[in-house]
């Protein structure tokens, strides 16, 4: 094992012991926010320390076997050689596992998210494709046991959506869907096309992590303009009787959010504020990372909305993810929600890139 990696592991062990002591202090237990943060960090370190313990136990077993290999007894030496071989193989496997555990965690991996789909070039056909994408993500969410809630929607004239915003909640939602941000291109023959010509349209997808209730983005109520209006769409007669829908404008930035998914104006306001907070935090993070352009253009892409990440070719039943040059002729399966055929290779590529960076430290 490289000395730099061993040093990192020892520092993590020291931190693990430090947190253990802090959690036992009465002052920590009385501070709920600090206690929760330390508990999360402790839980993240637990698998690393457990694996490190296994690694060091195996190192000790290897040292003992090498000592035995110097014995005068031939039978003992042969047994020791076999133990040496097994211990070395275990050490290699454990080191690989430790390197994966050392990869920096995405601070948003435990969060829920907002998924925004907007029709781009292509008019009605782009709006229809936005509807296809929403159904794909809804089926994918169902496969993983996540909950998908519609926050706001603007329907297309011929179906689909000009824009649709949803909230997806559930374990692992962000870690799997975070690679979906970008431009999604579709190539197919529209139903209205009499000549059979293939048209190209596009939609943009933005995936934003939902901030915690105690997030560090502070919104000044004086900087908000709140408008109410009557909700449109499904919902029975109720939507025509009360101004339950909410539109909030953040005056300093011009960011506008709407929510009309709930019958309660209070609930719609809370949802809209949460979405506004997510957008403002995303903008803040983008500004902070503007100087790290090269890092943001790793193999899985930067996630910029303008970046074309994927092409859906209906005549050929083909889907191509341009970030990792992966082409699959399983378009229908993926549109039915089997998105892991793309997500897993993206996650693997991202992890490989992180491991390469770790090895270069």
From Swiss-Prot:
Assigned keywords, A-Z: Cytoplasm, Methylation, Protein biosynthesis
SUPFAM superfamilies in the record: Release factor
Annotated localization: Cytoplasm
One Pfam family from the record: PCRF
UniProt GO MF annotations: translation release factor activity, codon specific
Ranges where the record places region Disordered: 285-306
Modified residues (N5-methylglutamine): 237
Highest rank taxon of the organism: Bacteria
InterPro entries: PCRF, Pep_chain_release_fac_I, Pep_chain_release_fac_I_sf, Prokaryotic/Mito_RF, RF-1
Keyword Cytoplasm: yes
Family assignment from sequence similarity: Belongs to the prokaryotic/mitochondrial release factor family.
Xref: NCBIfam families: prfA, PRK00591.1
Function: Peptide chain release factor 1 directs the termination of translation in response to the peptide chain termination codons UAG and UAA.
Protein name: Peptide chain release factor 1
Taxonomic source organism: Alkalilimnicola ehrlichii (strain ATCC BAA-1101 / DSM 17681 / MLHE-1)
Gene name of this polypeptide: prfA
């Amino acid at each position: 094992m490289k000395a730099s990696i061993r040093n990192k592991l020892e520092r993590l062990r020291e931190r693990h012991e430090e947190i253990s002591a802090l959690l036992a202090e009465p002052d920590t237990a009385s501070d709920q926010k600090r206690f929760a943060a330390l508990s999360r960090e402790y839980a993240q370190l637990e698998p690393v320390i457990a694996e490190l313990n296994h690694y060091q136990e195996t190192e000790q077993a290897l040292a003992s076997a090498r000592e035995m290999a110097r014995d005068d007894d031939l039978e003992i030496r042969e047994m020791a050689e076999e133990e040496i071989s097994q211990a070395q193989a275990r050490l290699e496997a454990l080191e690989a596992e430790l390197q994966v555990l050392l990869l920096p965690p995405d601070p948003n991996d435990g969060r829920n998210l907002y998924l925004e789909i907007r029709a781009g070039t292509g008019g009605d056909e782009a709006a229809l494709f936005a509807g296809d994408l929403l159904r794909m993500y809804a089926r994918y969410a169902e496969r993983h046991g996540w909950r998908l809630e519609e926050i706001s929607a603007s329907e297309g004239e011929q179906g689909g959506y000009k824009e649709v915003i949803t909230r997806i909640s559930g374990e692992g939602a962000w870690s799997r869907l975070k690679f979906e941000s970008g431009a999604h291109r579709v190539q197919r023959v529209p139903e209205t096309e009499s000549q059979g010509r293939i048209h190209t349209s596009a939609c943009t997808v933005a995936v934003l992590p939902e901030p915690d209730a105690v997030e560090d983005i502070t919104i000044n109520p004086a900087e908000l303009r709140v408008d109410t209006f009557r909700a449109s769409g499904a919902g029975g007669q109720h939507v025509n009787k009360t101004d339950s829908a909410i539109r909030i404008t953040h005056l300093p930035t011009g960011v506008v959010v709407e929510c009309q998914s709930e019958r309660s104006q209070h609930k719609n306001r809370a949802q809209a504020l949460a979405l506004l907070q997510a957008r403002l935090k995303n903008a803040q993070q983008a500004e902070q990372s503007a100087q790290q352009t090269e890092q943001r253009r790793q193999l899985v892409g930067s996630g910029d909305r303008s970046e074309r990440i994927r092409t859906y070719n209906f005549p050929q039943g083909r889907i191509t993810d341009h970030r990792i040059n992966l082409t699959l002729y399983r378009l229908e399966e993926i549109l039915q929600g089997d998105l892991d055929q793309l997500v897993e290779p993206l996650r693997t590529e991202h992890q490989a890139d992180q491991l390469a960076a770790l090895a270069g430290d």
